[in-house]
A protein has these predicted regions:
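Extended HEAT/HEAT-like alpha-solenoid repeat tracts in very large eukaryotic scaffold/adaptor proteins
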Residues: 22-25, 123, 127-130, 263-267
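Fungal transcription factor middle regulatory core
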Residues: 4, 8, 47-52, 94-199
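Short, flexible/disordered secondary-structure transition segments
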Residues: 37, 83-87, 104-108, 138, ...
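C-terminal transcriptional activation/regulatory domains of eukaryotic transcription factors
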Residues: 1-65, 72-82, 115-119, 195-231, ...
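Fungal C-terminal regulatory tails
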Residues: 97, 177, 185-201, 231-340
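Classical protein tyrosine phosphatase
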Residues: 82-96
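Core helices of alpha-solenoid repeat scaffolds
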Residues: 42, 46, 67, 261, ...
Length: 340
């Protein structure tokens, strides 16, 4: 369908409609994943997409094309823009979905137009799921409110070969339950952790999303004083190791998925919190991964993240040195008493 509409657009170069925002959005993402440095062409594509979407004033329910264009815009912003601007855009997107009615399953007993009938059911669910994923995690990162759709949970996506969106969207229900405004029963945290760890995630972006959710659950554990079993801790460390490997692969592959930067930093923090010999042994690889990402994506934020990680490790070492001094003093005192 996309290529058919693209070909039709080339045949009518003077035409202008909202689907141009989709075409510009796809081209901008293609450019982002094709080269490390932003080009003038990419900036023009992004600005053209923004102009098309903003110029189509909403006088009625938003169309599927408008929502699709906004999904692409928000995906691009999640990887390139500031968190606050991405949060605002993703919140707007959820409101557009609600206004369009795409989040509702089609029903017969209505006289009102239903845009969800004009969209393939599987594509509709994917649009909604990706929009929720970006809005949810951007709001979680900032500690701000997410926009919740008043609708039943998404139906399962159709299984397709070489399609990994299903892996990502399977994480949505548990992610929703971790909303800070929810009073989640702490007894559900361990089953949720085990469920996420048992998920089959085959592609690096999906592995990073899985790891990001596990890190969120572990941080919630920290507030209730939960002690992991050795077996569960081993599974967690194995996933963290896979996530570091995935982050390095994506960074070298010019694939700036939005978790490439933040997950390695949060892994370092979690390794220090776990504070076991096995977790601390992973620190060199974790810091090297963060350093690699910072060298490839040479931004102030990445430099600050790398510096902060080094400082945290130094402070942890300093605390350990002070602990060792206490033990040494105790033994020296005991030795002096014994010789006396």
């Amino acid at each position: 369908m996309f290529y058919e509409r693209l070909e039709a657009r080339w045949r009518t170069p003077l035409a202008n409609n909202v689907y141009d925002g989709v075409l510009f959005g796809v081209a901008a993402l293609g450019s982002l994943f094709s080269q490390r440095n932003t080009t003038i062409t990419e900036l023009h594509l992004v600005e053209s997409a923004r102009s098309v979407l903003d110029l189509h004033q909403i006088s009625e329910a938003p169309s599927v094309d408008l929502v699709t264009g906004w999904v692409l815009r928000v995906i691009y912003m999640r990887m390139t823009a500031s968190p606050h601007s991405t949060w605002i855009a993703s919140s707007t997107l959820i409101h557009l979905i609600e206004a369009s009615g795409l989040h509702l399953e089609p029903f017969d007993d209505t006289v009102f137009p239903q845009h969800n009938l004009l969209c393939d059911p599987d594509i509709r669910r994917r649009l909604i799921g990706v929009a929720q994923h970006v809005n949810m995690w951007t709001s979680f990162d900032l500690g701000l409110s997410r926009v919740a759709l008043q609708s039943p949970p998404l139906a399962p996506l159709a299984s397709k070969s070489d399609d990994y969106t299903t892996e990502l969207l399977r994480l949505l229900p548990i992610s929703t339950n971790l909303d800070p405004v929810k009073t989640e029963d702490n007894r559900n945290l361990e089953p949720s952790l085990r469920q996420v760890l048992s998920g089959n995630h085959t592609q690096p972006p999906s592995v990073l999303a899985q790891c990001n959710l596990v890190l969120c659950i572990l941080r919630r554990f920290g507030t209730v004083g939960f002690n992991m079993s050795p077996t569960l801790a081993e599974q967690v460390l194995a996933l963290l190791n896979d996530a570091l490997r995935s982050a390095r692969f994506l960074a070298k592959d010019c694939s700036p998925w939005h978790h490439v930067a933040n997950v390695p930093f949060h892994i370092i923090c979690m390794l220090l919190v776990l504070d076991t010999r096995s977790s601390l042994a992973m620190l060199p690889e974790a810091l090297q991964t963060l350093e690699l990402v910072a060298s490839i994506y040479d931004t102030d934020a990445m430099k600050q993240a790398h510096s902060a990680a080094c400082l945290l490790i130094f402070l942890h070492q300093q605390r350990r040195s002070e602990d060792v001094k206490i033990f040494r003093d105790v033994l020296q005192t005991q030795g002096q008493q014994g010789s006396g």
